[in-house]
Amino acid sequence: MHQHDEGSSIVITKPSGMEIEINSGAMTRLAGVSEMLSGSTGIHMAVATVPPGRCSTAHYHVNCESALYVAAGKGAFLSGEELEIENEIAFGDFIYVPPGANHQPVNYSKTEDLVLIVARNAPVEIVVELENLGRKDC
């Protein structure tokens, strides 16, 4: 459910009204601000969840910058041409991903979800999955 304030064009999306987006590997993403939900044209926000011991597929975004905030959990953020760079991430960290940057979030916990708040500067993203790169064991 979301509420639309006609006077100011403010849209409030409740958790029950979030838009189910793509699955990328084991990662799921629910949008709260999107073109469909709020009519946004220059921003998008979502919550991405990576279950314990799992990861997204390796990928990059063609048309947008992304900013992520680690809201819960810990893991790694793989990046680089061959995903050879592994940075540990944990609650409170911010991550900037430019267009075209290969990346893959990985949840190393055996018990906790890795929860990422995702913002990007385009209402619809164009994603290229990198089937031959990244972790395959998660």
Where are these regions (language model features)?
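A short, N-terminal "cap"/entry segment at the start of jelly-roll beta-barrel domains
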Residues: 1-42, 57, 129-138
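Conserved short histidine dyad/triad with adjacent acidic residue
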Residues: 29-33, 46-62, 99
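Short, charged/polar surface micro-motifs in flexible loops or helix N-caps
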Residues: 38-41, 51-54, 74-76, 122
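Conserved hydrophobic/aromatic beta-strand scaffold that supports enzyme active sites
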Residues: 45-49, 67, 86, 94-96, ...
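Residue-level recognition of conserved beta-strand positions in structured domain cores
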Residues: 47, 60, 79-81, 107, ...
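A short beta-strand-loop-beta hairpin characteristic of the jelly-roll/cupin
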Residues: 55, 64-91
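Ligand-binding loop in jelly-roll beta-barrel domains
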Residues: 86, 90-91, 99-126
